[in-house]
């Protein structure tokens, strides 16, 4: 799962991150080679992703 820490109203744009479906979440997971957790800050919202779950989701849609 992913956890969103809200810093601005922009968080509504990232609501799907909770299910690891956001493109930036998945791409960031790939970039760090599926480490256990990764941080990315976009549009005033800091996102923590569990990259293992994200990578599984990518594998399922591929």
Curated annotation (Swiss-Prot):
Lineage top rank: taxon: Eukaryota
Official protein name in the record: Uncharacterized protein YMR230W-A
Species per Swiss-Prot/TrEMBL record: Saccharomyces cerevisiae (strain ATCC 204508 / S288c)
């Amino acid at each position: 799962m992913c956890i969103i820490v809200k810093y601005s109203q922009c968080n509504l744009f990232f609501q799907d991150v909770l299910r690891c479906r956001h493109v930036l979440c998945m791409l960031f997971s790939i970039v760090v080679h599926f480490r256990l957790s990764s941080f990315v800050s976009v549009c005033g919202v800091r996102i923590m992703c569990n990259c293992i779950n994200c990578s599984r989701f990518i594998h399922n849609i591929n």
